[in-house]
Amino acid sequence: MFINRWLFSTNHKDIGTLYMIFGAWAGMVGTGLSILIRAELGQPGSLLGDDQIYNVVVTAHAFVMIFFMVMPIMIGGFGNWLVPLMIGAPDMAFPRMNNMSFWLLPPSFLLLLASSTVEAGAGTGWTVYPPLAGNLAHAGASVDLTIFSLHLAGVSSILGAINFITTIINMKPPAITQYQTPLFVWSVLITAVLLLLSLPVLAAGITMLLTDRNLNTTFFDPAGGGDPILYQHLFWFFGHPEVYILILPGFGMISHIVTYYSGKKEPFGYMGMVWAMMSIGFLGFIVWAHHMFTVGMDVDTRAYFTSATMIIAIPTGVKVFSWLATLHGGNIKWSPAMLWALGFIFLFTIGGLTGIVLSNSSLDIVLHDTYYVVAHFHYVLSMGAVFAIMGGFVHWFPLFTGYTLNDTWAKIHFTIMFVGVNMTFFPQHFLGLAGMPRRYSDYPDAYXTWNTISSMGSFISLTAVILMVFMIWEALASKRVVKSVQLTSTNLEWIHGCPPPFHTFEEPVFIKSSQT
């Protein structure tokens, strides 16, 4: 039955497919919002109305891309599909909870979209800082709906995290240790731990904001002895681990892709890669206040957060150089997935370098809330997370569907996307250094040139997104079946054929230790 299979699904592959489709759909919505932003900023003067509308679009763009595109695709889609296959488990540990995790997302998305349509919408930015998010500056239900949306998305992620942690720790074959699982499995495990530890703090913060708005509490209101800075601490204690949650599964996928298309049987420095991810996960929790260098912290506090933030560059560097070492001496196959992976390494490194610039508290005081910050995090998200998703998608597409994408189209798609995102975000570094502030719908004429170029780049990216839809249609319509897959001895997910049967690993796997 259709309903039994897709509505009441307990199969990790089907739920993974649902996550993928939902994430792709949300990605279209988020892309549409980003095109609205770049259309508004394409030239000086007003296009879409006042700044409230503009900020509602910016806020929705951020929430949609983070909570309904990147996280569902990376953790829900790739995680559900690949983790059980990679560790030889018959399914996830809690299959029905897995289904609930997915079905909490569409209502959450609905609440977020509803928040934009009631009153004047939630024009708070994705950070939802009070007093702007309080009931005076944002009277009406908009921010409340956004908070409920975040609650649902948060519950979904927490349940998913519990599920992945249990699955990865308990459902491996007894003969293998955690240090014999693939890097993608490790990345999902670490991501799940980060989610489990950070989301409750966000839930606390936004619940306090909810009571401030509706029940007359004063957690964040100085008039009653509260402090708006407390909200910033609570939010960023979640918000900083969150950005690592968005990129860590990507690290795992890139490790697999680089290894596979270099013709290697294992990545360079496996243990170093694992420890680097664990270090990044740990350090991600003790650097949150680098988002708050401008709120007037003590100089010694700023010194600590500056140095702690810079330390994260070390494990990140370990990962980048290990990827390069994996490429070294390999029989490199220039497949589309490999192009995405190489693009990821290059552009993520650039994003990391601007991150090091911003970690200096003294420099950040000048650059905070300018387009330099926007350029920085879009290099790591729009060219890190998205390139990893695209690389993983074209690499595992034959596994998910049993069909192959057209190689030439896939390479053309990569090229258009590469040009588009760089043309969009590279000029924003110049705008930021010239002092153009974020979250404004209009700007002085002096900034016109780079903004126009940036907006042109965004339309090139839009072309790439449309081409991707065509590519998927073309692949599903042409039905070129997969003949054989290489390197299956170290890529366990492929051993059941493409696509794998509905139930895999129905009996425990026999592990033979090889002394090679």
From Swiss-Prot:
Q: Which membrane topology describes this protein? A: Multi-pass membrane protein
Q: Where are the transmembrane segments?
A: 12-40, 51-86, 95-117, 141-170, 183-212, 228-261, 270-286, 299-327, 336-357, 371-400, 407-433, 447-478
Q: Which PROSITE patterns match?
A: COX1, COX1_CUB
Keywords assigned by UniProt?
A: Calcium, Copper, Electron transport, Heme, Iron, Magnesium, Membrane, Metal-binding, Mitochondrion, Mitochondrion inner membrane, Respiratory chain, Sodium, Translocase, Transmembrane, Transmembrane helix, Transport
Record text on cofactor binding: Binds 2 heme A groups non-covalently per subunit.
Q: Where do we see the 1'-histidyl-3'-tyrosine (His-Tyr) cross-link in this protein?
A: 240-244
Write down the EC number.
7.1.1.9
The entry's Na(+)-binding residues are 40, 45, 441
Positions annotated to bind Fe(II)-heme a: 61, 378
**Reactions accelerated catalytically:** 4 Fe(II)-[cytochrome c] + O2 + 8 H(+)(in) = 4 Fe(III)-[cytochrome c] + 2 H2O + 4 H(+)(out)
- Domain of life according to the entry: Eukaryota
Q: Does the keyword Cytoplasm apply?
A: no
Indicate what this protein is called per its UniProt record.
Cytochrome c oxidase subunit 1
Q: Which organism is it from?
A: Zygogeomys trichopus (Michoacan pocket gopher)
